[in-house]
A protein has these predicted regions:
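Long, well-ordered alpha-helical scaffolding segments within enzyme catalytic domains
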Residues: 33-44, 151-166
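Surface-exposed, charge/polar-rich loops and edge strands
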Residues: 100-103, 107, 137-138, 148, ...
Length: 270
């Protein structure tokens, strides 16, 4: 069990936009603001004893935890330079924590399994390479649910609340805008009122003075938000936010609001 003795050892929860494939570590100009943000983010966090990542790039039929002691690498992107398929992030896994989380989810009637073979996908190894390049903090992943039900993902977060008094960093690794056809792959920041409307709605929901029940209901009904399906033709990059908010159950702080791949993206900290 992680350290619970110090009252300052509270879980930290963050949702951020992780960029396009390996581009953030290739000095891609359209990721400059994001890279700077991620490199400085640990300075405003306590050093965690473990990192749990809910990545947009892992979906399973039931909640699945990465259970490897020494996770391999899963290069889940295509068409990039050869060196991007040689990236390593040799952080240890945390099978004990995976087993404990599986127990928590099962106690909350969420069917769960552990995958001892799966490796780190780029939703983990790209941001953590920027944040914790020493790769010396145990890390693991929790999958999304393939049905992409927003209520189910809020429930995943609620089930994780038993970890709130432990020194763990929970990362929702997605993208607050994820329309592949609309990205500017040349990094040109162009006005996009439709995306602005959605990002502003998301900021209001996560940081505004509303009740937690209203906050959660708005996220359940996220498709009613302005330009929702333009910003998320498919919602796998948004749903890590639902897990984070379901776990935190409080108002977030906006910690990033800038351009990535020519589109505005945001990040929140609880």
């Amino acid at each position: 069990m992680l350290n619970q003795t110090n009252s300052q050892n509270k879980a930290q929860i963050v949702y951020f936009s992780h960029g396009g494939g390996p581009l953030p570590i290739l000095e891609d100009a359209s990721h400059k603001a994001m890279v700077e943000f991620m490199r400085h983010l640990p300075s405003r966090l306590k050093r965690p004893e473990a990192i749990l990542v809910i990545s947009a790039h892992w979906e399973e039929g039931i909640a699945t935890l990465l259970g490897a002691q020494t996770p391999t690498m899963l290069y889940d992107y295509y068409g990039f330079p050869d060196e991007t398929y040689e990236i390593t992030y040799p952080a240890p896994g945390s099978p004990d924590l995976a087993n404990r989380i599986a127990g928590l989810l099962n106690q909350n009637n969420i069917p769960t399994r552990i995958d001892p073979q799966r490796g780190f996908d780029h939703g983990l190894f790209i941001p953590l390479t920027l944040m914790y390049p020493q790769a010396d903090i145990p890390a693991l992943q929790l999958s999304l649910l393939r049905g992409l039900d927003p209520t189910a993902h809020l429930s995943l977060g609620t089930a994780l609340r038993a970890l709130m008094h432990e020194n763990i960093l929970v990362v929702g690794s997605g993208f607050s805008f994820h329309n592949m056809r609309a990205f500017s792959w040349h990094g040109i920041n162009t006005p996009d009122p439709a995306n602005d409307d959605f990002q502003n709605w998301l900021i209001e929901v996560c940081t505004g003075p509303i009740s937690q029940s209203e906050r959660e209901q708005r996220l359940i009904d996220w498709q009613k938000a302005p330009s929702a399906r333009y910003c998320h033709p498919r919602e796998e990059h948004l749903l890590p936010l639902h897990v984070c908010l379901g776990m935190a159950k409080k108002t977030a702080t906006l910690i990033f609001d800038d351009y990535i791949l020519g589109k505005r993206g945001v990040a929140f900290l609880w």
